[in-house]
A protein has these predicted regions:
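Surface-exposed loop/turn motifs in large extracellular/passenger domains
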Residues: 1-169, 173-296, 300-333, 337-552, ...
């Protein structure tokens, strides 16, 4: 490698996976079909087949026993680019990188002994620097494979894992200081391998996979729009550098997926289609040897800007699997729009079962479904639709949510006209739907034939529907039909500090109970809870209440006040009809 082959850029994605400050990134065009300087490039292809692409400096022979080399490390921090096209001050369009059957990517380490990291491998459809990347694609076809190497995480100040940036990246269209549009990644029955070092019995790895990605080293805005990530066969596998098989070994892959992502600007109209993703691989002869992946999916994301009109479609052929990994928890997250300055008109569609039989129990277990996440700005017109599905992890659904950074609370300025519709769904832990903002109005949450089942032995965090505003919560509707929940804490509330008005909760054919042998729990149903609660309506038809042995356990009212001397409640209405079955004691 000659130094004059290396390019340097001011960028944000460089030192660790969570960093957003501007720093210098060094880039090496490692394997490029077409490279231009101050010119555009189109219709180029890079096809990899029947071979291994490796960055290894020393390859230990498999058929000869020799002494391992000294454990020296170059500690390089380079982005190794493998792409059909590389433009410097030019646009890249309609280019393809194709990974075919028996092609194997093993980039990012300098030896096969301790797997010391020596760079961040980028497998890309096309890359444009100081230009736009449009209509490019990365195809990872059946029978191909990509390796992910160990990357030890550190905890940031918010308690999140942050990895060394020298991890594997798969990108459809990449731009430095440019826009990305209509780029695609197709993953079809491909093998994704966690490669662990010798003398280890547990390992962590990380991966970034994005159909369109923009890195930026200035304050100028760039747009990631209409990019598509399509996954129909992400098959997790593992490889260990042990001379003989250990008694136990556990690898965990943290994988982040984006339809479109920008460091600075807007993420608009990006899509993820998630069809088949196998996240657990066990050894045939020893179930104590296994690899597992924990996922975050973001249809559209901006680290400094808005995320609007993005869509995440989940229709899994096989549900995600759960395992008792060495981390002690199972957690997956799905985001429609992830932003800092506004997230609107984002949609999450879910069909078919989400997870398999529950083996794990931890306070950290979660299936997070977040239509909109933003630190400020509006979170309006976001939607979550779930139909004919099941989860054995606790389910937390947010149309808009509070965020805590550096011990400070951040709320969207508004959460209006959001919608959650859940039909024919069972959660075998807890089910919670939350909307949190400074103002929340005209939101709708609808259940039809939904179960929230809590086993006695499970860690019970309660099942809830809560619309909560710091200022006003008006004209919201919670409509529940054919619903049952036996969580210890059932709460169905519309609440705001200053005003809760013209809200409506409708409950038809519903059962509330407690799974615990103690038969102790809390049930709260209040259509308007505020310092000023008025014109709220609670309608109940055919309600079944199981045994609650503890006192002060059931609160059902169209409105309630906070207890302040100036608080007021008026013009609220309660309707109760049909069969009201209450446990005799």
């Amino acid at each position: 490698m000659r130094e004059d082959e290396v390019l340097s850029f001011k960028a944000r994605h460089g030192v660790n996976t969570a960093g957003h400050s501007i720093k210098t990134v060094r880039v090496l065009p490692f394997l490029i079909t077409a490279k231009t300087d101050h010119a555009d490039a189109s219709y180029n292809k890079l096809i990899l087949e029947q071979g291994e692409l490796s960055s290894v400096f020393y390859l230990k022979p498999k058929d000869t026993h020799i002494k391992n080399p000294s454990n020296s490390k170059s500690n390089q921090r380079m982005n190794f680019l493998m792409s059909s096209t590389f433009t410097h001050y030019g646009n890249a369009s309609y280019n393809q990188t194709i990974l075919q059957k028996d092609a194997h990517i093993s980039m990012g380490v300098e030896n096969t002994y301790d797997l010391a990291l020596n760079g961040a491998p980028y497998l890309i459809g096309a890359i444009a620097t100081y230009g736009d990347s449009t209509n490019n694609s990365l195809n990872i076809e059946a029978g191909s494979s990509v390796e992910f190497f160990t990357s030890l995480p550190k905890k940031d100040k918010n308690g999140n894992n942050t990895f060394d940036e020298r991890i594997t990246h798969l990108v459809g269209g990449l731009a430095y200081q440019g826009n990305v549009k209509n780029n695609k990644i197709f993953i079809k029955d491909a093998n994704m391998i966690i490669h662990g070092p010798s003398k280890a019995y547990a390992s962590l790895a990380a991966a970034h996979i994005s159909a369109g990605y923009i890195d930026s080293g200035t304050d100028k805005n760039f747009q990631a729009s209409k990019n598509l990530l399509d996954i129909d066969g992400f098959n997790l596998d593992m490889y260990m550098n042990h001379d003989k098989q250990p008694l136990a070994y556990n690898s965990v892959l943290f994988a982040d997926f984006w339809g479109g992502k920008t460091e600075q600007g807007q993420a608009l109209d990006n899509t993820i289609n998630l069809k088949d993703i196998k996240n657990l691989k066990k050894d045939k002869n020893n179930e104590n040897i296994f690899a597992q992946a924990l996922f975050n999916f973001y249809a559209g994301a901006s680290n400094n800007g808005e995320a609007n009109y993005n869509t995440l479609n989940i229709e899994l052929k096989h549900p995600l699997e759960i395992a008792n990994n060495f981390l002690g928890y199972n957690q997956h997250s799905f985001y429609g729009g992830f932003a800092t300055k506004g997230a609107n008109h984002n949609t999450i569609n879910i069909k078919n079962d989400l997870t398999t039989t529950d083996l794990s129990q931890s306070y950290k277990d979660a299936l997070n479904i977040v239509a909109a996440r933003t630190l400020e700005g509006s979170a309006d017109y976001n939607k979550v639709y779930i139909n004919n599905s099941m989860s054995t992890l606790p389910v937390y659904i947010y149309t808009a949510k509070k965020n805590i950074l550096n011990n400070q609370d951040f709320y969207p300025s508004s959460a209006n006209n959001n919608e959650v519709v859940i039909k024919d769904f069972a959660s075998f832990r807890n089910l919670t739907v939350l909307t949190e903002a400074k103002e929340a109005s005209y939101n709708t949450i609808n259940y039809n034939n939904v179960q929230s089942i809590t086993d006695v032995s499970n860690i019970d965090k309660g099942s809830k529907i809560i619309i909560r505003a710091l200022d006003k919560a008006n004209h919201n509707t919670i409509d529940i039909k054919n619903y049952s929940s036996n969580a210890a804490d059932n709460a169905y509330l519309i609440m705001a500090y200053n005003e809760a008005a013209y809200n409506k909760i409708i409950i038809n054919d519903t059962l509330f109970g407690v799974a615990s042998d103690k038969r102790e729990g809390i049930l709260s149903i209040i259509a308007g809870l505020s310092n000023n609660a008025h014109d709220n309506t609670l309608i109940i038809n055919n309600l079944n209440l199981d045994e609650y042995k503890n006192n002060n356990s059931i609160f059902i009212a169209p409105s309630a006040i906070t207890g302040l001397s100036e608080a007021k409640s008026y013009n609220n209405t309660l309707y109760i009809g049909g069969n009201l079955n209450i446990f005799k004691n």
